[in-house]
């Protein structure tokens, strides 16, 4: 999520200087050495928007690999690496993990609808003061269309394989499943701002 999911974003090596820059930024932003949920929400500006906060909480949990309710520097680097230059398949697996709210290995219509609604609301928060165009499809219509195109066996659930295959086969599905809230753009903007001071 974040940067657009594309096959070409597959650079995996992290430059040592870049890693040092990330560490300096992490220490400034998180002097305790860990990033807590409330700080993560603040970064995305969603403290007062419950639907958007729900989505950001799921993103946080997906990045919190060891489940200790914090993101340490290694998890932070892994998250940035995924968002900024991860391979398509890794990004899709991570996106699937965010969408699979109950962790059962499948995404049902309710789970997908909750995420799509949260992202619609988050995009409204991110666009405050900008053109607030009404989406062409409602969240329900988006979910129904995704299931029509991706649920190959018709069981009312999307498996990881269906999710990845559906995204690869159909550009519209890819766009809808990535539901880009631009954390990569946000991260780059924060890095630019800090470089100015």
Swiss-Prot record:
PROSITE patterns: EF_HAND_1, EF_HAND_2. One of its GO terms (cellular component) is cone photoreceptor outer segment. It holds the Pfam family EF-hand_7. Ca(2+) 3 binds at residues 151, 153, 155, 157, 162. Keywords: Calcium, Lipoprotein, Metal-binding, Myristate, Repeat, Sensory transduction, Vision. The keyword Membrane does not apply. One of its GO terms (biological process) is visual perception. Ca(2+) 2 binds at residues 100, 102, 104, 106, 111. Ca(2+) 1 binds at residues 64, 66, 68, 70, 75. Residues 15-50, 51-86, 87-122, 138-173 form the EF-hand domain. Stimulates guanylyl cyclase 1 (GC1) and GC2 when free calcium ions concentration is low and inhibits guanylyl cyclases when free calcium ions concentration is elevated. This Ca(2+)-sensitive regulation of guanylyl cyclase (GC) is a key event in recovery of the dark state of rod photoreceptors following light exposure. Binds three calcium ions. This is Guanylyl cyclase-activating protein 2. The lineage of its organism: Eukaryota, Metazoa, Chordata, Craniata, Vertebrata.
């Amino acid at each position: 999520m974040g940067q657009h999911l594309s096959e070409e974003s597959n650079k995996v090596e992290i430059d040592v200087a870049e890693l040092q820059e990330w560490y300096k930024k992490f220490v400034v932003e998180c002097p305790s050495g860990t990033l807590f949920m409330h700080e993560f929400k603040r970064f995305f500006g969603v403290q007062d928007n419950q639907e958007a906060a729900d989505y950001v909480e799921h993103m946080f949990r997906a990045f919190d690999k060891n489940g200790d309710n914090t993101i340490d520097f290694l998890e932070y680097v892994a998250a940035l690496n995924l968002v900024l230059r991860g391979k398509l398949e890794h990004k899709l697996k991570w996106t699937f993990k965010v969408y699979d709210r109950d962790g059962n290995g499948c995404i049902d219509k309710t789970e997908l609808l909750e995420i799509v609604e949260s992202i619609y609301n988050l995009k409204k928060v991110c666009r405050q003061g900008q053109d607030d165009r009404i989406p062409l499809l409602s969240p329900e219509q988006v979910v129904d269309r995704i299931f029509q195109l991706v649920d190959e066996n018709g069981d009312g659930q999307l498996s990881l394989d269906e999710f990845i295959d559906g995204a690869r086969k159909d550009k519209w599905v890819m766009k809808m499943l990535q539901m880009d809230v631009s954390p990569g753009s946000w991260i780059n903007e924060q890095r630019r701002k800090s470089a100015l001071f």
